[in-house]
Swiss-Prot record:
This is Transcription factor TCP3. InterPro entries: TF_TCP_subgr, Transcription_factor_TCP. Disulfide bonds: none annotated. Expressed in cotyledons, particularly in the vascular region, in leaves, roots, buds, flowers and immature siliques. Plays a pivotal role in the control of morphogenesis of shoot organs by negatively regulating the expression of boundary-specific genes such as CUC genes, probably through the induction of miRNA (e.g. miR164). Participates in ovule development. Interacts with SPL. Interacts with KIN10; KIN11 and FLZ3. Its main location: nucleus. GO terms for cellular component: nucleus.
Amino acid sequence: MAPDNDHFLDSPSPPLLEMRHHQSATENGGGCGEIVEVQGGHIVRSTGRKDRHSKVCTAKGPRDRRVRLSAPTAIQFYDVQDRLGFDRPSKAVDWLITKAKSAIDDLAQLPPWNPADTLRQHAAAAANAKPRKTKTLISPPPPQPEETEHHRIGEEEDNESSFLPASMDSDSIADTIKSFFPVASTQQSYHHQPPSRGNTQNQDLLRLSLQSFQNGPPFPNQTEPALFSGQSNNQLAFDSSTASWEQSHQSPEFGKIQRLVSWNNVGAAESAGSTGGFVFASPSSLHPVYSQSQLLSQRGPLQSINTPMIRAWFDPHHHHHHHQQSMTTDDLHHHHPYHIPPGIHQSAIPGIAFASSGEFSGFRIPARFQGEQEEHGGDNKPSSASSDSRH
C-alpha cells in the first residue's frame, strides 16, 4: 500500500492546459469577461455570453475568434475543408498551418502577449487622459440703467408711428366695417356748397311729383324752393329752400342739368327785351331702402312717368314783374293746365323750348312728383302735365 501511496503522492500532476486569471473588464479592456490562459496564448472569455463572442489575445491585442473571410477566400477554404473531409472549419485551418509550417517558421518572430503589460498600458492611458472640456456660455453684462432707458425710449419712438400696420389705416378700417355693416344713408357726401338755411320740416312733402305751374300766386304758408333767374344782363340769382343742397346735388339728373345751364344769348335777349327764368326745385332724395310698393302705397299713384324732366318756360307778359320768380311746393299742387306761350316752340329734344325769334328760352325743371295733395286741400284729379308731355 505504501508504494501505491507513494506513487500516488509522487505522481506528477497532469499538465495544466488552462490557467484562468479572473480580471475585471475595466482592467484589460477586452470586454466584460475573464482572461483564460490556453495552449499557445490567452483568450478573453465573455461573462454571461456565448463562447463564440470571446476574444483571443494576440501580439496586437485581443481579437475576435471568428474570422470573416471574403467571398472568394471562403469558397476556396470550404472547398479544401470538403476535400479533406473535415466537419469543422478549425480542423481545416490546422491542416493548412501544419502544411505551411516551414514557411511560417521563416517569418519573423513576434513577442508574445503579456496581460500585465497590457494592464499597465491601460492604466497609464487612463491616468494621462485629459478631462473633457465643456463650453460655458457667458452672458454679456447687463447695460447701464441710462443706456437701457435711452434704448427703450428710442424703440417707443420707432414703434409709435407703426402701432398699426400700413394696411390698417383709417380708410381701410372704415371700408371693412361698411362691408360687414352696410349703412343705408343718403347723406354721406359732403360738398363745398353752403347748406340749406330754410326749415327742413317739409322735406317729406318733396316726393315724387311732377306738376306744371302757371301764374297763380303761391301759398303764403310755404317756403320758396331754389330759384335761378336768368336775365338779359346774364346775371344768375340763387335762393336756397327747404330741401337740403346735399340731397338735391346727389341726383344724377341735377348734375346733367347743371352742366346744360349756360346762357350765351346775351345780345339776343337784350334786343328782344325778354326775360327767361330757370326754377330748380330741390326734392329730397328718396331713401334707398324704400321699395316701389311702399312708395306707391304711401304717396299715392304717380300722375305720369312720361313727362319730360326738363321743360322750358317763357312768358313775355311777366317782364314787368321782378326777375326772380319763386315757386313753392303748394304752387306745384295747383292743377292749372300746362300752357305753352305762343312765342315758344318745343324742339325735338324734350324739355327744351325756343322762342319765335329762334332764341333759347331756357329749361324748366320740375320740382317733384306730386304727392301729399290732401294736406293742402287739393283734389286728386290727374294733372294736365302728363297729357301735355305726350304732345
